[in-house]
Structures are given as C-alpha cells and as structure tokens.
Amino acid sequence: MTAIFRSASADDARFTDFSNQFLMAMPGMVNDELAGTVIYICEHTPRGALGLVLNRPTDLTLASLFERIDLTVAMGPTADEKVFFGGPVQTDRGFVLHAPAGDYSSSIRLGDLALTTSRDVLQAVAEGQGPARLFVTLGYAGWGAGQLESEMSQNAWLSVAADPVIIFDVPAEERYPAAMRLLGIDPLMLAGEAGHA
C-alpha cells in the first residue's frame, strides 16, 4: 500500500500534521457518525487525512469476518475479537492496524505500527501467524484537503499524541475517556456548548 496522499510541497509550510495523533470529538459534534468518537489518524498530508474510529465495535467478530471472506480459521483467542466501524468511507473494505509492522503486501508504516489493507495480513492472523497486536475495522474516517484543519480550527476535535496501549489494550468503551485523560481532561466535565458571560 502506498501512501494515501502525496507528499507536501513548499507551499504547505504552515501545514500541521496530525498523523499518529488521537482526535477526540468534542461534545456537541453534529456529525452523528463521528460524535463521541476517538480516532487514530494514520495519515495526514495537505491533500487530506485518513483515520480509524477506535471505539465503535460492530457485531462482527474476526471469526465471522474470516468466514465471510473464505479464510480458514485456525486461530485461538483472537477469534472472538470484534471488528470495528472504522469510519463512514469504504465500509466494505478492511483496514488492519497492527504491531509489529511485518512484511505484508499493502502496508504503510506508522512509526512502530503499520496499516495494512491486503488480505495476506488477515490470512496470517487466521493461521495464527499474524501480528501480535491488531485492530481490525471496516471503513475509515476521511477528510479532504483542508477539511480536518478547518474542523480543528472550529474546535470540533481535541488532539493528543497516540498511545498504542489505548488502541490495543483498553476496552472499546473506555478508549474515549482514556484518550481524554492523556490531556488531563475528565470528559464528564466538558460541556456540550460553550457558555457566554
């Protein structure tokens, strides 16, 4: 997998890269699909951004996903792990965030993690040979050129450096408050709308 978006140019000097960050939706977000979410930003360039929603499990398990795509399952405890709603874009396509990166045919490295969209990583997981840590989604959250920056300037999101522990080890329902705590914020103390004096 090559980079989703192309390299930045000299004209993009003021660009702020949110790659490898968590975005937490602020209370009051009007986009119902992303309200209350924490998103890991996999890639962000001046051309756009791609992220995965971390706290919206589906009813689908890895075992049932593998059955649907005709993979023979020989795996153990990961069979019951949930597949997540990664976002509203390409919801029929799988995205696997994993560590270690490994050598799969369609991957991009994201620091110590990798994002893979090819079937070979799922085949390796089904055979019990896959990455030690994985997070599987259907779909992704995407932003066009300047869209994420605009939403950030409107205070739709808070951002903080991503922590893989939250992605792989924290239960889905606790990921949003855990990401907020990285900023020292208690999500219960956030109001839905800013007040005016």
Curated annotation (Swiss-Prot):
GO terms for cellular component: cytosol. Coiled coil: none annotated. SUPFAM superfamilies: VC0467-like (SSF143456). Belongs to the UPF0301 (AlgH) family. HAMAP family: UPF0301. This is UPF0301 protein BAV3012. It comes from Bordetella avium (strain 197N).
